[in-house]
Amino acid sequence: MPTITLENVSKYYKNRRGNRSGRRYETGVEGVSLEIKQGEFVFITGSNGAGKSTLLDLISGRIKPDRGRVLLDGVSIAHPLPWQRERIALMFGRVVEEHTLIRKMTVEDNLMIAARVGRKRFETPQEMRDRIKKVLGLVGLSGMEGRYPVEMSLGECRCIELARAMINSPPVLVLDELTANLDDDSIWDIFHLLTEINRRGTTVIMSTHASQYVNIMRRRVVTIVDGQILGDVQKGRYGDVI
């Protein structure tokens, strides 16, 4: 059961024009230490630019830290050995803030690409189609295989992106602003869906600004301010700082 550990992690970005202090870099996160165990549901909260996306990118191995270590069961996510890379890649299902479905391809084709890129060993094309059918059922969109993203609502597209993240059965979902710009009903539907996914044992790590829903759900809440963790509260409320 994978445990994710961050040990004194920092990430900086070059700033060609400098900032008010004259420094040539900006802080993404600085001195972050965190442990997330399998089966947890963790909200990452904070204002725009606080470092939420950077933290999620570090956790999922999308970027490498400049200092510190990011570990999955003691194995470096940023610097794995060659034989560890595929295992680590299959551990994470990722949804980024930007919408990334290929608009001119069907839902089924979008999910097939993710399945192949993820390198999960589907024995036959039919096995892959059966998996696609299953994950679409999990997100409440059965029968949508032949639809195109342009024919669907924003909420439906976000659920398809979630299904795509789940196609290879990862034990960890890393979700960046999955509910951004959705109406209240769609937000609640997604949180209800994530609760069920988490109940089945999947770790959910999610950044969000949907404060009222975070307050209702009362899960673990990690609050980031200026790249540093200022709050980490079990059964917390949005923005809790301790």
Predicted regions and their residues:
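Conserved ABC ATPase "signature" region
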Residues: 125-144
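Conserved ABC transporter NBD signature motif
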Residues: 68-76
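Conserved ABC ATPase signature
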Residues: 148-152, 156
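Catalytic Walker B motif of ABC-type/P-loop ATPase nucleotide-binding domains
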Residues: 173-176
